[in-house]
Amino acid sequence: MRNKKWISLAVAVVLTVTALPATVFAAKDGESKEELTKVTLNEVAHSIFYAPQYVAIEEGYFAEEGLDLTLVTGFGADKTMTAVISGEADIGFMGAEASIYAYQEGATDPVVNFAQLTQRAGNFLVAREEMPDFTWDDLKDKRVLGGRKGGMPEMVFEYILRNHNIDPATDLEIDQSIDFGSTAAAFTGDMSADFTVEFEPSATALEREGKGYVVASLGVDSGYVPYTSYSAKTSFLNENPQIIQSFTNALQKGMDYVQSHSPEEIAQVISPQFPETDMDTLTTIVNRYYEQDTWKENLVFEKDSFELLQDILESAGELEKRVDYEQLVTTEFANTAIN
């Protein structure tokens, strides 16, 4: 498979994953940490896009479920998958395409998705100038700072382009050479780029600095897409079903919270996770995701969503052979968490 060297390395070797300072969440109501089960979660990025997860952390839902959670940021699905395969992390949070790549590379202990958090893409198309009448045809013959080849941000972007009869290879120039998290700085410094595809808070930051303007939401224009999900090795799922169930229960509580509270309330709760983001900006970003129906009501990863994901991979030329839904998805824990 083209451009899958990273996942081959993930299957073959153990790498050290760069982490944010480890965050341990203590129990409430006088419960000692010794009574909690330690679990390490490696997230693909630390983003407001994943608000329900941070609500679950800040509201103490993991501790309520008997878990002492350590959160690590992998800074990329390749690194997050490596951490899961190597055993550095018990659970990974990333695009489900990574589990498909690993499976097709011959993983002997497949990484299975057990909960889906987001149902839309979380990035935005940013232009240098305001474009109130923007259409996707405006990208023709332009230069865009995109994402890593084979990653969900780039594939969803290309999926939208194809849906608008735009050939990503010939109708525009997409720069895929810039590391995740560095595109906003590159856009500011490289005036040859006409557009950039950005997650929050970079999109809002560019707007507030007057250096860019959001002209389209990839989440809205791509439709409902299984963008990010939680996964673990088959062996871990089989040996630790109660840990996975408790973890999923805590997440469902976070999902319930965001469905029943305002963006202002959500922003207030998750603010300790983003100390460098002021409350006004945080609220603006949460509201942007809230209004486009980013988060599911439950964590069930439906078959139709998995098939759509594979359609996107196929259209991007990143899928050698389709994988059966039952091989890489289980809904047992998410369905139980609903009740």
Predicted regions and their residues:
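Short, low-complexity disordered leader/linker segments with a strong preference
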Residues: 1-38, 336-339
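Short, glycine-/small- and polar/acidic-enriched structural segments
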Residues: 30-169, 173-179, 186, 194-200, ...
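Soluble non-cytosolic domains of exported or imported proteins
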Residues: 47, 74-78, 93, 151-152, ...
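Predominant activation on well-ordered alpha-helical scaffold segments within soluble catalytic domains
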Residues: 54, 100, 158, 204, ...
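Pocket-lining segment of extracytoplasmic ligand-binding domains
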Residues: 129, 181-274
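Secondary-structure end/capping motifs
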Residues: 238-320
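Conserved C-terminal helix/tail region of periplasmic/extracytoplasmic solute-binding proteins
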Residues: 309-339
